[in-house]
Amino acid sequence: TQPQPEVPAYIFPLEDANAEVTNPYGWQAHPVTKQKSLHSGVDLAADYGTNVLAVADGTVLDCSYDAAYGYILTLEHENGIQTQYAHLSEFLVNAGAEVRQGQIIAKTGDSGWTTGPHLHLGVLIDGEAVDPLEALKSE
């Protein structure tokens, strides 16, 4: 029998794994308010209505609306890790649902304070925002 390929710990949240990072994690002037603040995630270029994928297995903690982030979905994963997907146009799962890595969970949009459609991906470890590109590197 053939050995099974190892499943990566995390996958990219968009089907286009080469999507451009249009706004990195870190302190910067907010593109809408112009005030300096921590950009607590990364913005990934995506057309309106692009499929958003769960980066890993988890439970949908919340699907809600926030004035700044617009429609935002939060997944809870193992080891105190949460992922947040913001500025969505549509939720495809409900709070409490179990999701699998790669499952389509939402559609990108431009809800909240944005300059256009994209996906804002945030990662929290034990409630603290960290750089998603570092935190979600597959080992």
Residue ranges and their predicted role:
Residues 2-69:
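Surface-exposed, glycine-biased beta-strand/turn segments
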Residues 24, 63-64, 91, 108-111:
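Residue-level recognition of beta-strand microenvironments
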Residues 50, 79-81, 128:
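Short acidic/polar mixed-charge low-complexity motifs
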